[in-house]
């Protein structure tokens, strides 16, 4: 699913919060099925990501239009996207804030990564067509595990 904002909430179990506009086709599917796959693309897919975000699944088949291929997920009915660096199978664990804030809380129940992608350059939406591309890693002292 295409979304422009998400946040890690917890690590054990992995919990993610995300905003999905109630105008989006995905919003109703997420409320009805209570599951999804968060697909994590790299910069090479940026044009397709914007295309998916600017169109509606009510009107077009995004997989066909943007030439994305799917694989079967193991825990949910939504498909994985083969071209993405990672796919996170999720189930909705809390939708109490969906009606007012479009905010869903998801538990990641299965994660997939492309092992051939050693240093993924993921993209992060800043709003209004602006993205940051991940790249440089810095390491600082930490007591976190």
State each model region's role.
Residues 1-145:
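Basic, polyanion-binding surface patches
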């Amino acid at each position: 699913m295409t979304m422009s904002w998400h946040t890690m909430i917890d690590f054990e179990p992995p919990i993610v919060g995300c905003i999905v506009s109630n105008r989006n086709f995905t919003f109703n599917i997420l409320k009805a099925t209570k599951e999804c796959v968060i697909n994590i693309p790299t910069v090479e897919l940026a044009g397709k990501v914007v295309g998916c975000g600017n169109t509606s699944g009510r009107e077009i088949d995004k997989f066909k239009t943007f030439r994305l291929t799917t694989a079967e997920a193991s825990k949910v009915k939504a498909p994985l996207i083969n071209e993405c660096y990672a796919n996170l199978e999720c189930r909705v664990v809390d939708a109490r804030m969906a009606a007012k804030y479009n905010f869903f809380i998801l538990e990641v129940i299965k994660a997939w990564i492309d092992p051939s992608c050693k240093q993924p350059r993921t993209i992060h939406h800043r709003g209004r067509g602006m993205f940051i591309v991940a790249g440089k890693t810095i390491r600082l002292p930490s007591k976190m595990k």
